[in-house]
Amino acid sequence: MYDDSYVPGFEDSEAGSADSYTSRPSLDSDVSLEEDRESARREVESQAQQQLERAKHKPVAFAVRTNVSYCGVLDEECPVQGSGVNFEAKDFLHIKEKYSNDWWIGRLVKEGGDIAFIPSPQRLESIRLKQEQKARRSGNPSSLSDIGSRRSPPPSLAKQKQKQAEHIPPYDVVPSMRPVVLVGPSLKGYEVTDMMQKALFDFLKHRFDGRISITRVTADLSLAKRSVLNNPGKRTIIERSSARSSIAEVQSEIERIFELAKSLQLVVLDADTINHPAQLAKTSLAPIIVFVKVSSPKVLQRLIRSRGKSQMKHLTVQMMAYDKLVQCPPESFDVILDENQLEDACEHLAEYLEVYWRATHHPAPGPGLLGPPSAIPGLQNQQLLGERGEEHSPLERDSLMPSDEASESSRQAWTGSSQRSSRHLEEDYADAYHDLYQPHRQHTSGLPSANGHDPQDRLLAQDSEHNHNERNWQRNRPWPKDSY
């Protein structure tokens, strides 16, 4: 009687209870698995934090100059959240060691810059590809530099920019200390320019005693371009056309400068052949260009005339060189010494180099430097020195002239420019250089700043040269105190 009776919902509820009972172990397993993952993540992050702390006491392995912008705060894959570096294009990074294929450990070269995780070239390339895929899906197949712009360029222009961007590596390997190069007021090899620059060399030698290497370079460093060093065809042509210095000699000098910079001392080059910033613009040296400027062509003419007939014979060529320098936009130089007094110019330069010294020297002790950049995988293809031939043992050749020799005449060359007023000089040399002298070229551009982009869309963005110039250069003073 009771066997045939049916209680509605009995089997269903019983089956449901069984299902609930059997599903509990699965839920518990998922929770346990999630806890294991979280525990493993915390362990990995703890180890990464410890390695970050240990890196503070390690020496600098090598340095790079950035060609892209990157915001580490927005990168969720950083080994330690909040410990990623932020940098803009044309910034400089000191690399301490390799953490993984995607991450390095180092610091941004600036005062107070702390040790942080730096994306490797492979990591930046991965981010770039993801952004390109995202842009294509959104129907805007533009290059990274076009992200955030108001209007998309024509397809042909966009493809051209994208093709150009693909050939630009995210980093360029540069010396650990940017070498200082003096140019101006005119051509090297003539008395006025040589005496004024020698006065600065003597000052730097004494002011930074124990922290500076001043070395003479006779090879033509303008030949040290990546396109030349990595192209055997161009190398052969230049070796035929250049009687003064071969590519092998230039490459040897570049390696020697890199070697000098490993000590993290200030490196000053007395480069015979460098008279214009454009000569070093495409090299791997990333130099600090110091323009020794005479404010008026009339003053320079008077200084040249005061050196006698032997210098007067070359007045025209010296004035033409001066004219080319003063026409350069201010951002072509890192420091412009336009003071009338030697003491003021020396203090100006010393102030800049003191700030740079503090920017490059992290408070943590560093016993020295590691091997060359090629010791870290992934950098061989980005070396700016080209394929190495025979190994040359780098020699630190300090070719300073005796510090007291001709010091008085050097001082007179500086002070002579302020002996007479501009009014008297105009009267003496009216129209003497009127046809040759050209005023400064105005350097303007309407490109928007990369900082105006939405931070969610600019984890990695190609920066324009003008944006960097606007950020790092102040027109009122040739050298801003906050450059580093």
Curated annotation (Swiss-Prot):
Residue spans of biased composition, Basic and acidic residues class: 387-399, 423-438, 463-484
Segments for region (Mediates interaction with the alpha subunit): 195-345
Principal localisation: cytoplasm
Start and end residues of each SH3 domain: 59-128
Keywords: Calcium, Calcium channel, Calcium transport, Cytoplasm, Ion channel, Ion transport, Phosphoprotein, SH3 domain, Transport, Voltage-gated channel
GO biological process: calcium ion transmembrane transport via high voltage-gated calcium channel; calcium ion transport; chemical synaptic transmission; positive regulation of high voltage-gated calcium channel activity
PROSITE patterns with a match to the protein in the record: SH3
Pfam families, alphabetized: Guanylate_kin (PF00625), VGCC_beta4Aa_N (PF12052)
Gene3D superfamilies assigned to the protein according to its UniProt record, in alphabetical order: P-loop containing nucleotide triphosphate hydrolases, SH3 Domains
InterPro entries: CAB1-4_N_A-dom, CACNB3_SH3, GK/Ca_channel_bsu, P-loop_NTPase, SH3-like_dom_sf, SH3_domain, VDCC_L_b3su, VDCC_L_bsu
GO cellular component: cytoplasm; L-type voltage-gated calcium channel complex; synapse
Bias (Polar residues) ranges: 409-420
Region (Disordered): 1-52, 129-170, 387-484
CDD domains, alphabetized: SH3_CACNB3
Function: Regulatory subunit of the voltage-gated calcium channel that gives rise to L-type calcium currents. Increases CACNA1B peak calcium current and shifts the voltage dependencies of channel activation and inactivation. Increases CACNA1C peak calcium current and shifts the voltage dependencies of channel activation and inactivation.
Family: Belongs to the calcium channel beta subunit family.
Assembly mode: Component of a calcium channel complex consisting of a pore-forming alpha subunit (CACNA1C) and the ancillary subunits CACNB3 and CACNA2D1. The channel complex contains alpha, beta, gamma and delta subunits in a 1:1:1:1 ratio. Interacts with CACNA2D4. Interacts with FASLG. Interacts with CBARP; prevents the interaction of CACNB3 with the alpha subunit CACNA1C thereby negatively regulating the activity of the corresponding calcium channel.
Protein name: Voltage-dependent L-type calcium channel subunit beta-3
